[in-house]
Protein backbone atom coordinates (compact mmCIF):
# COMPACT_ATOMS: atom_id res chain seq x y z
CA UNK A 1 0.00 0.00 0.00
CA UNK A 2 2.91 2.34 0.67
CA UNK A 3 4.87 1.61 -2.51
CA UNK A 4 6.63 4.51 -4.19
CA UNK A 5 4.68 3.96 -7.41
CA UNK A 6 2.12 6.76 -7.85
CA UNK A 7 2.45 7.45 -4.11
CA UNK A 8 0.85 10.89 -4.44
CA UNK A 9 -2.28 9.62 -6.22
CA UNK A 10 -5.50 10.07 -4.23
CA UNK A 11 -8.75 8.20 -4.81
CA UNK A 12 -12.28 9.25 -4.02
CA UNK A 13 -13.96 6.68 -1.78
CA UNK A 14 -16.61 5.70 -4.34
CA UNK A 15 -13.95 5.25 -7.02
CA UNK A 16 -11.81 3.20 -4.62
CA UNK A 17 -14.81 0.99 -3.81
CA UNK A 18 -15.35 0.24 -7.50
CA UNK A 19 -11.72 -0.84 -7.86
CA UNK A 20 -11.88 -2.91 -4.67
CA UNK A 21 -14.91 -4.78 -6.03
CA UNK A 22 -13.17 -5.55 -9.32
CA UNK A 23 -9.89 -6.60 -7.75
CA UNK A 24 -11.43 -8.82 -5.07
CA UNK A 25 -13.72 -10.44 -7.65
CA UNK A 26 -10.64 -11.46 -9.63
CA UNK A 27 -8.85 -12.72 -6.49
CA UNK A 28 -11.91 -14.82 -5.62
CA UNK A 29 -11.86 -16.31 -9.12
CA UNK A 30 -8.21 -17.32 -8.67
CA UNK A 31 -8.82 -18.62 -5.13
CA UNK A 32 -7.69 -17.50 -1.69
CA UNK A 33 -5.77 -20.64 -0.70
CA UNK A 34 -2.27 -19.36 -1.54
CA UNK A 35 0.07 -19.36 1.50
CA UNK A 36 0.90 -15.87 2.81
CA UNK A 37 -1.83 -14.46 0.59
CA UNK A 38 -1.85 -11.00 2.19
CA UNK A 39 1.86 -10.76 2.94
CA UNK A 40 4.19 -8.32 1.21
CA UNK A 41 6.91 -10.96 1.71
CA UNK A 42 5.17 -13.62 -0.41
CA UNK A 43 7.66 -15.37 -2.71
CA UNK A 44 5.42 -15.04 -5.77
CA UNK A 45 4.79 -11.32 -5.34
CA UNK A 46 6.06 -9.53 -8.45
CA UNK A 47 7.15 -5.90 -8.09
CA UNK A 48 7.12 -5.33 -11.86
CA UNK A 49 3.66 -6.86 -12.23
CA UNK A 50 2.33 -4.78 -9.34
CA UNK A 51 3.71 -1.61 -10.92
CA UNK A 52 2.01 -2.49 -14.21
CA UNK A 53 -1.29 -2.94 -12.39
CA UNK A 54 -0.92 0.39 -10.60
CA UNK A 55 -0.06 2.16 -13.86
CA UNK A 56 -3.13 0.60 -15.48
CA UNK A 57 -5.31 1.99 -12.68
CA UNK A 58 -3.72 5.44 -13.00
CA UNK A 59 -4.30 5.34 -16.76
CA UNK A 60 -8.03 4.71 -16.23
CA UNK A 61 -8.17 7.63 -13.79
CA UNK A 62 -6.43 10.09 -16.10
CA UNK A 63 -8.12 8.91 -19.28
CA UNK A 64 -11.42 7.19 -18.40
CA UNK A 65 -11.96 5.58 -21.79
CA UNK A 66 -13.17 2.13 -22.80
CA UNK A 67 -9.68 1.33 -24.11
CA UNK A 68 -7.99 2.20 -20.81
CA UNK A 69 -10.56 0.17 -18.91
CA UNK A 70 -10.02 -2.80 -21.23
CA UNK A 71 -6.25 -2.56 -20.73
CA UNK A 72 -6.76 -2.59 -16.96
CA UNK A 73 -9.06 -5.59 -17.22
CA UNK A 74 -6.42 -7.45 -19.23
CA UNK A 75 -3.83 -6.73 -16.54
CA UNK A 76 -6.24 -8.10 -13.93
CA UNK A 77 -6.76 -11.29 -15.91
CA UNK A 78 -3.06 -12.09 -16.27
CA UNK A 79 -1.76 -10.98 -12.85
CA UNK A 80 -1.02 -13.48 -10.11
CA UNK A 81 -3.00 -13.39 -6.89
CA UNK A 82 -0.22 -11.86 -4.75
CA UNK A 83 0.19 -8.94 -7.15
CA UNK A 84 -3.56 -8.41 -7.07
CA UNK A 85 -3.50 -8.26 -3.27
CA UNK A 86 -0.68 -5.70 -3.50
CA UNK A 87 -2.83 -3.64 -5.86
CA UNK A 88 -5.75 -3.90 -3.43
CA UNK A 89 -3.53 -2.51 -0.67
CA UNK A 90 -2.36 0.30 -2.93
CA UNK A 91 -5.95 1.29 -3.71
CA UNK A 92 -6.93 1.36 -0.02
CA UNK A 93 -3.82 3.38 0.84
CA UNK A 94 -4.81 6.03 -1.72
CA UNK A 95 -7.98 7.00 0.13
CA UNK A 96 -7.43 10.23 1.99
CA UNK A 97 -9.32 12.87 3.89
CA UNK A 98 -8.33 16.42 4.71
CA UNK A 99 -8.83 17.34 8.36
CA UNK A 100 -8.38 20.60 10.25
CA UNK A 101 -6.11 20.45 13.30
CA UNK A 102 -4.78 23.04 15.72
CA UNK A 103 -1.03 23.46 16.00
CA UNK A 104 0.68 24.43 19.26
CA UNK A 105 0.18 28.11 18.44
CA UNK A 106 -3.54 27.49 17.84
CA UNK A 107 -3.06 28.03 14.11
CA UNK A 108 -5.57 26.05 12.05
CA UNK A 109 -3.71 23.62 9.79
CA UNK A 110 -5.23 21.46 7.05
CA UNK A 111 -3.68 17.99 7.15
CA UNK A 112 -3.98 15.08 4.72
CA UNK A 113 -4.77 11.81 6.48
CA UNK A 114 -5.13 8.28 5.14
CA UNK A 115 -7.49 5.51 6.20
CA UNK A 116 -11.26 5.51 5.78
CA UNK A 117 -12.70 4.25 9.10
CA UNK A 118 -12.86 7.06 11.71
CA UNK A 119 -11.11 5.92 14.88
CA UNK A 120 -13.55 7.75 17.18
CA UNK A 121 -16.48 6.01 15.49
CA UNK A 122 -14.85 2.66 16.15
CA UNK A 123 -14.10 3.35 19.83
CA UNK A 124 -17.60 4.65 20.55
CA UNK A 125 -19.08 1.57 18.84
CA UNK A 126 -16.78 -0.72 20.82
CA UNK A 127 -17.88 0.85 24.10
CA UNK A 128 -21.56 0.59 23.15
CA UNK A 129 -21.12 -3.03 22.08
CA UNK A 130 -19.92 -3.91 25.58
CA UNK A 131 -22.89 -2.15 27.16
CA UNK A 132 -25.25 -4.05 24.85
CA UNK A 133 -23.82 -7.41 25.89
CA UNK A 134 -22.02 -8.11 22.60
CA UNK A 135 -25.09 -8.62 20.46
CA UNK A 136 -24.69 -10.61 17.25
CA UNK A 137 -26.04 -7.49 15.51
CA UNK A 138 -23.10 -5.36 16.65
CA UNK A 139 -21.51 -5.20 13.18
CA UNK A 140 -24.76 -3.85 11.77
CA UNK A 141 -24.74 -1.16 14.45
CA UNK A 142 -21.21 -0.15 13.41
CA UNK A 143 -22.30 0.15 9.78
CA UNK A 144 -25.19 2.41 10.84
CA UNK A 145 -22.73 4.80 12.51
CA UNK A 146 -20.72 5.28 9.30
CA UNK A 147 -21.39 7.37 6.22
CA UNK A 148 -23.06 5.27 3.54
CA UNK A 149 -20.05 5.36 1.23
CA UNK A 150 -17.72 4.37 4.07
CA UNK A 151 -20.06 1.55 5.10
CA UNK A 152 -20.19 0.25 1.53
CA UNK A 153 -16.40 0.14 1.25
CA UNK A 154 -16.00 -1.46 4.68
CA UNK A 155 -18.57 -4.12 3.75
CA UNK A 156 -16.69 -4.92 0.54
CA UNK A 157 -13.35 -5.20 2.33
CA UNK A 158 -14.72 -7.27 5.22
CA UNK A 159 -16.53 -9.64 2.87
CA UNK A 160 -13.22 -10.38 1.14
CA UNK A 161 -11.19 -10.62 4.36
CA UNK A 162 -13.76 -12.97 5.92
CA UNK A 163 -13.34 -15.31 2.96
CA UNK A 164 -9.57 -15.17 3.39
CA UNK A 165 -9.77 -15.88 7.13
CA UNK A 166 -12.14 -18.80 6.57
CA UNK A 167 -9.40 -20.43 4.45
CA UNK A 168 -6.67 -19.80 7.03
CA UNK A 169 -5.81 -23.52 7.21
CA UNK A 170 -4.43 -23.16 3.68
CA UNK A 171 -3.27 -19.53 3.45
CA UNK A 172 -2.25 -19.10 7.14
CA UNK A 173 -4.17 -15.81 7.29
CA UNK A 174 -5.94 -15.97 10.66
CA UNK A 175 -8.13 -13.01 11.73
CA UNK A 176 -5.24 -11.77 13.87
CA UNK A 177 -2.86 -11.78 10.89
CA UNK A 178 -5.48 -10.22 8.65
CA UNK A 179 -5.77 -7.40 11.19
CA UNK A 180 -2.02 -6.82 11.12
CA UNK A 181 -1.91 -6.63 7.32
CA UNK A 182 -4.96 -4.41 6.85
CA UNK A 183 -5.27 -2.39 10.07
CA UNK A 184 -3.29 0.62 8.90
CA UNK A 185 -5.13 0.59 5.58
CA UNK A 186 -8.47 0.87 7.38
CA UNK A 187 -7.47 3.39 10.03
CA UNK A 188 -4.41 5.08 8.54
CA UNK A 189 -0.94 5.73 9.92
CA UNK A 190 -0.08 8.82 11.97
CA UNK A 191 1.88 11.49 10.10
CA UNK A 192 5.28 12.65 11.41
CA UNK A 193 5.05 10.42 14.49
CA UNK A 194 7.85 8.74 16.42
CA UNK A 195 8.54 5.03 16.02
CA UNK A 196 6.88 4.32 19.38
CA UNK A 197 3.76 6.29 18.42
CA UNK A 198 3.57 4.65 15.00
CA UNK A 199 3.96 1.17 16.47
CA UNK A 200 1.28 1.87 19.09
CA UNK A 201 -1.06 3.03 16.30
CA UNK A 202 -0.25 -0.12 14.32
CA UNK A 203 -1.18 -2.35 17.27
CA UNK A 204 -4.42 -0.44 17.89
CA UNK A 205 -5.42 -0.56 14.23
CA UNK A 206 -4.55 -4.27 13.95
CA UNK A 207 -6.63 -5.20 16.98
CA UNK A 208 -9.52 -3.01 15.85
CA UNK A 209 -9.53 -4.55 12.37
CA UNK A 210 -9.53 -8.07 13.81
CA UNK A 211 -12.42 -7.04 16.08
CA UNK A 212 -14.47 -5.66 13.18
CA UNK A 213 -13.71 -8.72 11.04
CA UNK A 214 -14.88 -11.13 13.74
CA UNK A 215 -17.99 -9.01 14.32
CA UNK A 216 -18.71 -9.15 10.58
CA UNK A 217 -18.28 -12.93 10.48
CA UNK A 218 -20.35 -13.43 13.63
CA UNK A 219 -23.18 -11.29 12.27
CA UNK A 220 -23.35 -13.25 9.02
CA UNK A 221 -23.20 -16.59 10.85
CA UNK A 222 -26.15 -15.46 12.98
CA UNK A 223 -28.09 -14.41 9.86
CA UNK A 224 -27.53 -17.71 8.02
CA UNK A 225 -30.56 -19.96 7.74
CA UNK A 226 -30.59 -23.17 9.76
CA UNK A 227 -30.19 -25.29 6.62
CA UNK A 228 -27.30 -23.23 5.25
CA UNK A 229 -23.99 -25.08 5.36
CA UNK A 230 -21.32 -23.12 7.20
CA UNK A 231 -17.68 -24.21 7.28
CA UNK A 232 -16.72 -25.53 10.71
CA UNK A 233 -13.60 -23.39 10.65
CA UNK A 234 -15.76 -20.29 10.29
CA UNK A 235 -17.87 -21.33 13.28
CA UNK A 236 -14.74 -21.94 15.37
CA UNK A 237 -13.36 -18.50 14.52
CA UNK A 238 -16.38 -16.74 16.04
CA UNK A 239 -17.02 -19.15 18.93
CA UNK A 240 -15.01 -17.15 21.49
CA UNK A 241 -16.02 -13.67 20.35
Predicted regions and their residues:
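Well-ordered alpha/beta subsegment
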Residues: 138-141
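Amphipathic alpha-helical oligomerization segments
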Residues: 79-82, 132-136, 146-161
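Catalytic and GAP-homology cores of small GTPase regulators
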Residues: 1-131
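Short sequence/structural elements of tandem HEAT/ARM alpha-solenoid repeats
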Residues: 120, 155-156, 173-176
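C-terminal regulatory/linker segments that are acidic, Ser/Thr- and Pro-rich
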Residues: 1-11, 15, 19-21, 166-241
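Short amphipathic alpha-helices and their capping/turn residues within compact interaction modules
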Residues: 28, 32, 62, 66, ...
